[in-house]
């Protein structure tokens, strides 16, 4: 993802995330050097993933696919690309947090062999508070 992609990716973020990152948080993630990838169809961004790398751990910070393109392989492509890129960058593990109420996402990550490691109580605040399930994948 480059700076010119941020607006399109942020529009997807607002569309699909029940508690979206603020615009400042979204843009500052790019500015601080987090890694990011986009999925495009005919030059239109239909999905994105943002992750950080600390030593040998890759942290999936945010992923989103436009509603019209969900369940059509874009999320899988983004996740597989994140895993591959993380390996290239030297990571041995990918971890993430997911809302405990988000059964579709939990199923999706489990399908790609992520394991449930722990629960963080009251991790998500705002209008839809929720616990987070911590998941990880050895790569």
Give the ranges of each region predicted by the language model.
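Short glycine/proline-centered loop/turn elements that form peptide/ligand docking sites
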Residues: 79, 102-105, 122-127
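Acetyl-CoA-dependent GNAT
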Residues: 3-68, 79-81, 85, 89, ...
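Conserved catalytic-core motifs of GNAT/GCN5-like acyltransferases
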Residues: 97, 110, 115-131
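Glycine-rich acetyl-CoA-binding "A-motif" of GNAT/NAT acetyltransferases
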Residues: 44-47, 104, 129
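Conserved acetyl-CoA-binding loop-helix of GNAT-fold acetyltransferases
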Residues: 71-86, 107-111
